[in-house]
Every structure is written in C-alpha cells, then in structure tokens.
Amino acid sequence: MPMLLQADALDLSELIRPGDTVLWGQANAEPLPLTQALMEQRARIGRFRVMLGIANSRTCRPEHADVVDFLAYCGAGANRELANAGALDILPSHYSQLPGLIASGALRIDVLMLQLAPADSHGRYSLGIAHEYLLPALDHARVVIAEVNRQAPRTFGERTLGDADLDAILHTDRPPLENPPARIRDADARIAAHIAGLIDDGATLQMGIGAIPDAVLGALRGHRDLGVHSGSLGDGVAQLMQAGVITNARKNRDRGVSVGGVLLGSRVIHDFAHDNPAIQLRSTTYTHDPDVLASLDRFVAINSAVEVDLTGQVNSEIAAGSYVGAVGGALDFLRGAQRSRGGLPIIALPSTAGANSRIVARLNGPATIPRSDAGLIVTEFGVADLRGKTLRQRVECMLRIAHPQHQATLETQLQANATPL
C-alpha cells in the first residue's frame, strides 16, 4: 500500500534524494501541492534536478536555482522567466523522442509526481489531465508520488493505475490549473480563414497551442465530420465536438474518438472530457508515432513559428535572443502530414511582430524545421505552398505572403547576402 501523505506534515525529503531528477505532468497536469512543497523543501533535500514541460504556474522561479537545476524541452509559460534569468537548460528534443530518452535512461527520471483523478469502484486511478511522456517515466522511476485530486477529470486512456503503482498519495480537493483564453487578433482571424479554406470535410486535425489554432477552430464551424489526433486538446475541440462539427466519424483509425496527450485549456475541456469516452488521452509513443500519423487520411498538421526564412526554414525556438518555444512536436506532425494521403503540413504565423517582419531573409535563431520539410506557410496575406518548389520559386512565394511594407527590404537583404540560397 502507498504511504498516505498529509498536507500539513508533508516531508518530501523522505522520498527524494540529492542528485535525483524529478518530473511531473506539464501545464494543468501539474500536481501543485507537491511541486510547491518540493520547492519549499529544496534546501532540506539537497541539490536535485527538475525536468519541466509547459509551466502554467510560477512554482519554479529563478531564486530556486540555488539548489535546483532546471531543464525543460521548451521555454513556454513560466519557463521563460527561468530561461531569461539563465536558470534553465534546454533539452532540444523532438517530442517523439522523449519517451525513448526516458525509457533508455538517457534522460533518467528518479521521481515522478502525478495528479490523478480519484479511484473508481474498482480501485483504479485515471491519469486525469495528461498521459504523454508520463507513462515511460512511470515504468522507470524509483519513486512515484501522486496527488489524488477530487476535482481532476477522470479521462479515458490507454492505462489506469492501482495502489501498487504508487509509493505515496496526497489527497486534495482543488480546481486544476487552467489556460487563459488566447487573444485573437485580426491577423490571426485572417490566417484562420485561409487555413479553413484548405481543409476538407472529414479531415483529421492536429493543432498547436495559441491564438492561431484557437482562431482556426473557430473558423471551422461550417465544416462536417472533422476528426482530431493531436498532442493537446483544448476548449475549441470541446466546443466543436458539442456543436457536431468534430465527430471523428471518418477517421480510419480511432473512429469516433478525439485523441490527444494532454488537456490544455480551461474548465470547459476538463468538464467535457470527464467520463467522456469520445476523448481519449494516449502516450506520446502513440500521439506522435510517425506510422500512426501517416496512416490517418487527410491529416492536417497546423503549427506556429517564431519566423520563417524565404526558403522555408523555420525557427520555432528563439525570439529576440530569448528561448520562448521548443523543438517540440511540430516536425513530428509535419512529417506525418506529408506522408498522409491527402495530408497538409501547415506552418502559420502573423507576417510581423511589432515593427519587424517574421518572414526573414535569414533566420535569427536555429533552423528547428529544415527547408527540406517545408510544406505550406500561411500568413494573413495568403498561402505559400512550397512543396515541390525550387529555392528561387520559394523566394517568390514567400515574398508574396510577407507584409507589403517589408517586401522590398527582404529583396534587398537577399541580394546583399553573398551566400547562395
């Protein structure tokens, strides 16, 4: 039987050792009472390491680096504060690689912290808000500590847990964290309209996170029998399922089911997913599997970027010298869409950020996605289909979707650069 922990007498130093690496569910799956206690007790434990995903709380702050070494696969959310303070190291991994890194021990996870939904009548716990890379960590961690949260949604997935899987349990009753709604600007809405015009009825969608994916979902209300296979599921998915737009009726696998790895939204998606067999959470080994993605007909992958150069190279990691994004799952999904029958690999972004063009002659950060994987690039000014295009043809296409105020400057910069395309 697992040890029963008490919130007012919680001593994690009995379970966590100096030198350990600790992992927990990202975003709204964070077991907040456990992670907060971990940071408060860090000096008592001794130096250890934390592997972060998207951070929707400020549980981990730069001052905690006095004892804690932070690493993450992304700079999203509150991770940006750690990165800007020089307190965060980045794991530049494709999302599909994370389970293998954990299982092989290349990314050793000693302690796993989970937020679970209460046990059912059979004594089985749902993983609640996230599956993702938590399953391989569950199989390899020395210690598994669970917050069993009375308000966590009970979701369907590939695995449930019993007491034998857990070393310690803390019972709580609190609202899970939520994602605030993204602010959709005019440029986002125009981009969404372009993308919606590319999507056929019966297509299966993968969406990244942020204003553009939310705007795209809002622009699809006139479509029929859409499906979803994505890394994350948000409020827009719940709303389109309730409206009968997303039915998953034409998917050639997981028919009738929206598949994702994590719920990334507000109480809207949490409540909708609760005890709902039409939503299933799966491990990253399934959601990002290249063969699974390729097998989905009309698979449309829609992801964002910091900037794209005139030949189709994509920087999804660094903006203005700060690590704000990730290698993440974009390339996994884009390659899946390229292999899918009737698939569409889409990168979408506004043409500008303030006074600066996001269509650039040369990237100001790494080439997260190489130009050999370029598909369709969409801004508010149109669609550049780079598939099968030569470098010169790509430049022409990309200039047409750049902001008109920057087109002449981009041409001048390209001509001034002595290196070939």
Where in the sequence are the language-model features?
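Conserved alpha/beta enzyme-core scaffold
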Residues: M1-L421
